[in-house]
Amino acid sequence: MVNATFDTAAIAAIQALIGKTFNGYTYSPVAAGAYGNILLHIDGTAYELRCNQSPLTVGNETEDIACLSINMHTGDFEPMAGEVITTESVEQIIKEICIIRDAVTRADGVQLSMDMAIIIKTQNAEYMFSRDVWFSEFITISNNGDLDSVYPICKAKSGWKSDESEDVIIKRTTIRL
């Protein structure tokens, strides 16, 4: 099993954000999101959400798999791509945080577990920061907590197939923190 998921410490840190004020987020706009990193401002503290490729052993090969991570951030925001920096204000209490996880089983039997999105739910809105294809470092930003409407499983499957004869099974689950 290949794990491209938040570790236990990251899950605990994310869960600790519930009940705090989501002040907003800072990013360098690229299409409908950001390339590589976003700053989440929560109760006056900055947390950097990153989507970076990491070399992982997948079957008999090493593949660069994009993985989500989150860490406290100090200093100026340095976007991985882009020069324009935008800050979106939210100023709402976090009621719930969800992580969307895909369990992938490839035709060759290799299994992967990948965190695909983090959804921050406030009293008035949902803010989803999601990734798509397994190698992409792009983070899509949307005000809807439905990953299937942004990146459906059929699209995720096509990203794993080298030809149409290959079968890929993807099970998507929501982890409520």
Where are these regions (language model features)?
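Surface-exposed, interaction-prone regions used to assemble/regulate multi-protein complexes
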Residues: 1-177
